[in-house]
Amino acid sequence: MIQPGRYRHYKGNDYEVMGVARHSETEEEVVVYRALYGDRGLWVRPLAMFLETVLIEGRPCPRFQFVAKYPTPQEK
């Protein structure tokens, strides 16, 4: 399962993952995340695609790599 926090896309940009939601028509699980650069756009991506491995110069690499957990209010 996906935990909220900071993730790095294989192309180098960081994103804040907010959690997993469900598509209203298909009930497919999607990851809800926000870019931590530019206009900080809000995005969704199918969970399976978010978790998949891509080939970069012939080497397997996670599409998104977990970088850091965000502290809960109790941990602050």
Segments from the language model and where they lie:
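Mixed-charge, low-complexity intrinsically disordered regions
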Residues: 1-76
